[in-house]
């Protein structure tokens, strides 16, 4: 009886936090198997769901556990139901029919797919800023056109959108070699259309794009402001594929509703499926990225050096890659194998322009800037008052303290009047969820971050 109450409470919390489509995908499909010795065994039908539950929903398990069991419940995830083979048999049968393409078409040579083989899910570093987008991309790569169609991923430059598009295409071809897949930047699609139009070969163009099983378009914002004929052709291509239940995945530097210069009917179609954002990597993710990028270079990057670098570049992955290139160049010239903080600081001096500004951001500076923005005092932020504007400021400050510093959760909680670390976890998850849904809040936080730095 308690297990049912416990699970229903979790679903209630999840419904408040998640969008409808995410709730249906991540929460409804999950199931609590048992709760014993303060461990909740939770069945997830897909292994990639674990990261979402662990990073985005774990705190609601803790809250529900205290409410129902008066104890801290730890989740344990399983991906096969005990003594239950029915679901796997159904899934296997589904896969057999899903990829039985009809009519049969000649597969596209890999060189013509536009894909880059080096970009896979295996070497994509997941973190809080991209977990939803990665999970959606994985879901699409398992169930073409049955999960989210189109899938629209947006975020700033250098955050991994192109990597994810290629990973989807490569994963599909690994499992379905005869699938017709095409990756192409929007600008190249436009040029291809204009070339075929000029040569009078529009039937060839239509056949190329409208016979695909998977179309991956990068930087769709490039279509904004283009001539009516160009947007009309993409509109018709989109409709032709969608009507045949073929998968479309798009990326952009902004959300569909902020794509100016596009016909409204296109914007509407971009929102038909699922829209996910990618935000800059947090401190832990930046360290993981640096570890992945440096482990095979033949140099010894000390752990404190990686932490130092992670603290200097927080806007995108390209900055981290550029810093690594700067460092390895100096190391090669000086014939150095051990990369210390001093070596790293020297190497990235030009990139940072002023090394004297490479300071750790104190939490009180974050509190000050957030307080100034929302008209809330630091005393109120550290207190326990629950007025809406104070709660928002407090949660935003906690969120930024975790994103912009390497302080531990208990340390952050202490700086906010001795709050428990679970409060920090909840605040971070709450703001992260709101950012994904509210562009105005996302812009507010970006504005605050610029003032902090």
UniProtKB/Swiss-Prot annotation:
It comes from Streptococcus pneumoniae (strain P1031). Domain I is involved in oligomerization and binding regulators, domain II is flexibile and of varying length in different bacteria, domain III forms the AAA+ region, while domain IV binds dsDNA. Pfam families: Bac_DnaA, Bac_DnaA_C. The gene is dnaA. Coiled coil: none annotated. Belongs to the DnaA family. One of its GO terms (molecular function) is lipid binding. Its main location: cytoplasm. Plays an essential role in the initiation and regulation of chromosomal replication. ATP-DnaA binds to the origin of replication (oriC) to initiate formation of the DNA replication initiation complex once per cell cycle. Binds the DnaA box (a 9 base pair repeat at the origin) and separates the double-stranded (ds)DNA. Forms a right-handed helical filament on oriC DNA; dsDNA binds to the exterior of the filament while single-stranded (ss)DNA is stabiized in the filament's interior. Keywords: ATP-binding, Cytoplasm, DNA replication, DNA-binding, Lipid-binding, Nucleotide-binding. GO terms for cellular component: cytoplasm; plasma membrane. GO terms for biological process: DNA replication initiation; regulation of DNA replication. ATP binds at residues 158, 160-162. It is found in: Cytoplasm. The keyword DNA-binding applies. Residues 114-331 are annotated as: Domain III, AAA+ region. CDD domains: AAA, Bac_DnaA_C. It comes from the Bacteria. Oligomerizes as a right-handed, spiral filament on DNA at oriC. This is Chromosomal replication initiator protein DnaA. Residues 74-113 are annotated as: Domain II. Residues 1-74 are annotated as: Domain I, interacts with DnaA modulators. Gene3D superfamilies: 1.10.1750.10, 1.10.8.60, P-loop containing nucleotide triphosphate hydrolases. Residues 332-453 are annotated as: Domain IV, binds dsDNA.
